[in-house]
């Protein structure tokens, strides 16, 4: 009996320490994390970072809507071919996630929504300056901005899960790109797994 009571007490303490938000709560969350990014036609993924701020409003104790702004570094790696040496594409976006979240348990939420993105920079890195770049994004130098052909906007669908404990939030989501990265030519799209750590500040009593 004592063991059962001890287990119950521990479970009670654990549950009470989980984040429980009430209807009408409004929070902001600075966050930083890792991107494992690729493009739909790429050979290899690439590790990059993201950082930003998200806000969340609880419509009920289980359902919330949130939005944010994040600087997200994305891209991919490509193996060497007969005409090109190996190269790496770097894409910087300001991503604006708009998410609906449902709390299955206190602190544990599943989420999805839509994520518009706005291109800030597009670069490519090559091992050899002598590679003919005319057929690849119109680039002619080792690292050059490609404003002519890379789409300025990106739309993706994020699907994820988050766990909150004492205001600390661990978030994992996968962003499935819908729009083409290039305005013309081959139709490849962003694919990004994001793992982040954040801290929630409650702005309402």
Task: Please describe what each predicted stretch is.
Residues 1-31, 197-201:
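Bacterial Sec-dependent N-terminal signal peptides
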Residues 30-34, 51-57, 69-71, 96-102, ...:
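Residues on the lipid-exposed face of transmembrane beta-strands in outer-membrane beta-barrel proteins
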Residues 35-39, 72-76, 117-121, 175-179, ...:
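Structural signature of outer-membrane beta-barrel domains
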Residues 41-42, 73-92, 120-153, 180-186, ...:
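Flexible, solvent-exposed loop segments that connect beta-strands
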Residues 44-86, 90-94:
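Glycine- and aromatic-enriched membrane insertion/assembly motifs of diderm outer-membrane
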